[in-house]
Amino acid sequence: MNVKDETFWSVHNLCVNYEHAAVLYHISFSLGKGSLTAILGPNGAGKSTLLKASLGLIKPSSGTVYFFNQKFKKVRQRIAYMPQRASVDWDFPMTVLDLALMGCYSYKGMWGRISSDDRREAFHILERVGLESVADRQIGQLSGGQQQRAFLARALMQKADLYLMDELFSAIDMASFKTSVGVLQELRDQGKTIVVVHHDLSHVRQLFDHVVLLNKRLICCGPTDECLNGDTIFQTYGCEIELLEQTLKLSRGKQFGSC
């Protein structure tokens, strides 16, 4: 198969239940090379669950998931996963540089030796995300936006082809937002595929060329201009797009002022 036509992530009839309640119901879609995709949906829609079930972090009830037309374990070195910030132990005694260097483990293994070249590359990546001045700081001492950028640096060190990012833009300052967007667009232009669980509809058309609309079931997957409309928004969120965007604008102003 031509790499240009390679399917990076394909989900087939995926179902996930928690205590007999359906969280994801027969989800099927696929994403190819070189896209910047947002997974959108209300709280409880199953967005994070979709990532975790695809990566084997939780067990699906049924269905199959393939990355690059293979099971995850065979191609895990080609995939970078960024968890939600709330799931991280920020008291762990690790510096920002140490966190970035963890990205090497995907291709060196847990016991692989970290070389001076690796350290130089990690520091260069920290410069790229604007964290070189806090490289030796313990990760819990960072602001929310800096913490997100530190995990972005770790993902970049993995040199992956597919990036799955759970709420990358949640509760970050505007400087971190702009830096992160620039990095993601560079990756997309290099032929990488980036998937971000996202909440703010007011940014979607400007940032993402593809969307996955989800509310326990798949509403739409495809180019943003084709999928994002009044009908699909109503199916996903249960309200009109104008009201939803007004609410999100107010919450976004509070969000960017809090970091």
Swiss-Prot record:
<dbReference type="InterPro" id="IPR027417">
    <property type="entry name" value="P-loop_NTPase"/>
</dbReference>
<keyword id="KW-0547">Nucleotide-binding</keyword>
<feature type="binding site">
    <location>
        <begin position="41"/>
        <end position="48"/>
    </location>
    <ligand>
        <name>ATP</name>
    </ligand>
</feature>
<dbReference type="InterPro" id="IPR003439">
    <property type="entry name" value="ABC_transporter-like_ATP-bd"/>
</dbReference>
<dbReference type="GO" id="GO:0005524">
    <property type="term" value="F:ATP binding"/>
</dbReference>
<comment type="similarity">
    <text>Belongs to the ABC transporter superfamily.</text>
</comment>
<dbReference type="GO" id="GO:0016887">
    <property type="term" value="F:ATP hydrolysis activity"/>
</dbReference>
<keyword id="KW-0472">Membrane</keyword>
<dbReference type="GO" id="GO:0005886">
    <property type="term" value="C:plasma membrane"/>
</dbReference>
<dbReference type="InterPro" id="IPR050153">
    <property type="entry name" value="Metal_Ion_Import_ABC"/>
</dbReference>
<keyword id="KW-0067">ATP-binding</keyword>
<keyword id="KW-1003">Cell membrane</keyword>
<feature type="domain" description="ABC transporter">
    <location>
        <begin position="3"/>
        <end position="241"/>
    </location>
</feature>
<dbReference type="InterPro" id="IPR017871">
    <property type="entry name" value="ABC_transporter-like_CS"/>
</dbReference>
<keyword id="KW-0813">Transport</keyword>
<comment type="function">
    <text>Part of an ATP-driven transport system CPn0346/CPn0347/CPn0348/CPn0349 for a metal. Probably responsible for energy coupling to the transport system.</text>
</comment>
<protein>
    <recommendedName>
        <fullName>Probable metal transport system ATP-binding protein CPn_0348/CP_0412/CPj0348/CpB0355</fullName>
    </recommendedName>
</protein>
<keyword id="KW-0997">Cell inner membrane</keyword>
<dbReference type="InterPro" id="IPR003593">
    <property type="entry name" value="AAA+_ATPase"/>
</dbReference>
<dbReference type="Pfam" id="PF00005">
    <property type="entry name" value="ABC_tran"/>
</dbReference>
